[in-house]
Amino acid sequence: MKKLLLIFFLFPIFGFGQDDCGTIPTQQQIDYLNQTRNARKNWNQSKSPLLIPIQNHVVRETDSTGGLTIVDISFVMNTLNTYYINSNIQFYECDSINYINNSNYYDFDGNDESVFCAQNDIQNVVNIYYFNSVISSSGAGVCGYAYFPPGPDRVIMNSSCALNGSTIVHEIGHYLSLYHTHGPTNTGTTTELVN
């Protein structure tokens, strides 16, 4: 019985091997967000929806197996539009899905991002990359991460997390300059964001 209880209490330690979000703003991004806060506050909600083009990049094994399907990408796009339409923001696919068949990147290491994305990014759109798994440049397994303005127009996603109905919305929120509710750090320490 004691062994069973020990296993029961140790299970949660091993059950959380992946952090949800790998997005941590740089000081430059924090300064930019602070400087542009008033412009964002004054954005007129009565305007036509803000249309944001998306280029979806699905990374698969070299033999074309794995990766998200067209139906999966449709789910992601519908999820984004459902969550953001009340903020007068609408997303659309600017081109067909870019399938990247390369087993070297199927399980993604954030240290390879600059080289890999330089070959695939499309300018002036949000590039969303879907990998089998994502390890951030700090070595943590994450569901995804994005860049605050004025960073790269890019979101990196673990494919399974992209389909959970919330992580892609969360990461696009960072792209749109939203902090975590606990402030600009990715720790449990809270920074007060309300005056």
Model-derived features with residue positions:
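Propeptide-to-catalytic entry region of secreted or membrane-anchored zinc metalloproteases
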Residues: Q18-V126, Y130-V134
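Extracytoplasmic/secreted envelope proteins and their assembly/folding machinery
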Residues: S74-M77, R154, V169
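Glycine-rich adenosyl-nucleotide cofactor-binding module
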Residues: G151-C161
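Sec-dependent N-terminal signal peptides
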Residues: K3-G17
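The catalytic-center signature of Zn2+-dependent metalloproteases
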Residues: C161-N195
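Catalytic zinc-binding patch centered on the HExxH motif and its immediate surroundings
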Residues: A118, N132-G151
